[in-house]
């Protein structure tokens, strides 16, 4: 589907952004549009494509977040937060170091 292609391309950008952010994390891409980010303390952030809802879902220690494609980005329905801004905050929290993620 068009959505799956869009989401998969975004997941690849997210993976590259996390790999290049300088944080000491392990990132693994799994089948079905899933990224698993593991931190030194054993905590994880899971980022996945949710095709039925047409969203990218993020599960972190501080909660779950759902993002929809709009205006060239991915925006949370709940509070209007942008995907990369949210991921920067979540990765920073769990890595214990300030990290800024940007889409390439």
Functional labels for PLM-detected ranges:
Residues 1-104:
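N-terminal intrinsically disordered, cationic/polar leader segments
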